[in-house]
Amino acid sequence: MKNTFGGALALTIFGESHGRAIGGVLDGMAAGVPVDEGFIAACMDKRRARGDGLSTPRVEADNVHLLSGVVNGHTTGTAIALMIENRNTRSGDYAKTADLLRPGHADYTAYAKYHGFQDARGGGHFSGRITAALVAGGAIVLGALDRAGIDITTHIARCAGISDRPFALDDAAALAAQVSVLESRGEGFALLDASVEEPMKTAIRAAGSEGDSVGGILETAILGLPAGVGEPYFDSVESLISHMAFSVPAVKGIEFGTGFGFADLKGSEANDAFRMKGDSVVTATNHNAGINGGITNGMPVVFRTAVKPTPSIYKEQETVDYIAKQDAPLSIQGRHDPCIVPRAAIVQTCAAALAVGDLMTARYGTAWMERPTGYRREGL
């Protein structure tokens, strides 16, 4: 079992939903990079449950303890170990159904792989709880990317059948303005159209009151990536971003730019025409989401991820008792989200940051962290 993502810049995660703690080790950061613990806390707060009928009643403080690799607000150049304690667990909720395989969960696949030795409490290592470690590690990289002029943000494109305005894929200036709007918003859903927030909340609460759940779509934009980042084929920009995107539990689909819409276009419609803008090469449209041949072309990278409904629902379901080897009904206990889409937005942002950070480090070494305003001018 390997719990590490990344080559040049890597994050290893550990822990289980009801264990003593979860956390990670971030390796590959240069020395002297500022680490804003207030920013990390703000990112964690966006992921944190509120117990408000829109998310799980399990509310954790999610304080991030930096155990190594950071002194006086700057990286030391050694591995950054971080830990988040689990304090609000109720493992007894799972005792009565321990032998029943929950539909949509990893109970059966974990049993098939680990032969009963896995920690099944609250989903164990497969729980969405572990995404707190992704956010904590990703937030450190996200801050470094921001100083290098690279912006990453995510909004709720669709939730419970209700849609937000899409990102302006073909207008980089309009997209930058949309990103600024999202980053200026405080608490609340990550939306471009604030008028759809209450209808979304109403739909989520309605599903929860019925013992059910809903899913949605997240849309992520990456601005400021220079041309020439990424590798053809196996380590393409799409490959590594997708790798991390699918590391977020409940993500079941991804598309870049026009994505599956390409199937209905002609080549003359799908190609992004090149043109000069001052000394820079840009494209007139951005169907390919700033990526050609697996390598960035300098235009914004935009992708969408499909998030399935939370599998933990309170309606009675059909399953099997894998110890008794017989069919059985299942009524799930415990505390669960009627929808994880709003909380998953920051998770997807931080997951993308880890992928982009690894890509940037593979291309520029640690120069982009050490000289965030100068590495592009150095012609590396």
Sequence positions of predicted segments:
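Generic N-terminal targeting/processing segments that precede catalytic cores or assembly contacts
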Residues: 1-380
